[in-house]
């Protein structure tokens, strides 16, 4: 559910930014201005998003907003995956029973239900 909301938010941001570029490009009637705008847009397309999270400083001194937004979304998604505590959250470890019979063979995150049910029941043969 939470990942669906995040993906919808991400798609909404991408679509609104692309619509904003189309509207601003159609307002200029001068073809020289339109050619200059197209060349600037081509330069933006070849710019990579930095992994450090800092915004990119362009030649004209402006900050690339797409790179800044991409870094912000990447940081947000990493925090959402880690959980609210900042550590990898594992459900059910607080209620772990110390008398559990097969605790040395349990793996974090999954459980073999067939083996567990076979060991819990003692069959009289």
From Swiss-Prot:
Propeptide: 21-105, 114-125
Annotated compartments: Secreted
Modified positions (Phenylalanine amide) in chain numbering: 113
Keywords: Amidation, Cleavage on pair of basic residues, Hormone, Hypotensive agent, Secreted, Signal, Sulfation
Signal sequence, renumbered to the chain: 1-20
Lineage top rank: taxon: Eukaryota
Coiled coil: none
Listed PROSITE patterns: GASTRIN
Main location: secreted
Protein family (similarity comment): Belongs to the gastrin/cholecystokinin family.
PANTHER family xrefs: CHOLECYSTOKININ
Protein name per the record: Cholecystokinin-8
